[in-house]
């Protein structure tokens, strides 16, 4: 079984009778194994990265190199967007997300400027988002810090930590001894 919650991944499906594509998050590993009549597996490979096409397509909202909707959802049909997070989470919760998932020392300042900006007008695009937060970073650190901010938002939007924990718990149950 191969899991990917992004429908765009279906374009890369291998035509092989031993391969089954599951358009879902790997957090549901145990459910789909049961559905396919599989009780145990010899190995599990989890790709925790983001595909380059996510960064290349500005309409997906994963990159600060272009403008488009502030989205960041791996599954375009589910969940909240990055704009939802930025516009609706409390300032404190935003700060926690930037600190925990982006390891940003100035997480409180980032959250504060976002809260002030969204009180005037909702932040819905990458361009609007960058206009608010870019002044917080020096030119020499800008790209590195923006990457951390975007990483933190992406992790929150897609509930990546929760999904990973669930998948690892399921993996411990279905992995054969010695697997």
What residue spans do the PLM features occupy?
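S-adenosyl-L-methionine-dependent methyltransferase catalytic core, i.e., the SAM/SAH-binding region
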Residues: 1-179
């Amino acid at each position: 079984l191969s899991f990917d919650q992004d429908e765009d991944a279906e374009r890369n499906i291998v035509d092989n009778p031993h391969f089954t594509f599951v358009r879902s998050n790997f957090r549901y590993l145990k459910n789909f194994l049961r559905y396919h009549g599989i009780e145990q597996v010899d190995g599990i490979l989890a790709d925790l990265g983001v595909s380059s096409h996510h960064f290349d397509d500005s309409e997906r909202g994963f990159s600060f190199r272009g403008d488009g909707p502030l989205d960041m959802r791996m599954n375009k049909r589910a969940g909240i967007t990055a704009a939802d997070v930025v516009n609706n989470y409390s300032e404190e919760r935003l700060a926690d997300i930037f600190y925990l998932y982006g390891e940003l020392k100035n997480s409180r300042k980032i959250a504060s400027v976002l809260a002030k900006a969204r009180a005037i007008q909702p932040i819905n695009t990458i361009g609007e988002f960058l206009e608010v937060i870019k002044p917080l970073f020096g030119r020499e650190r800008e790209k590195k810090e923006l990457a951390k901010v975007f990483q933190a938002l992406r992790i929150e939007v897609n509930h990546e930590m929760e999904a990973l924990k669930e998948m690892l718990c399921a993996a411990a149950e279905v992995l054969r001894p010695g697997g």
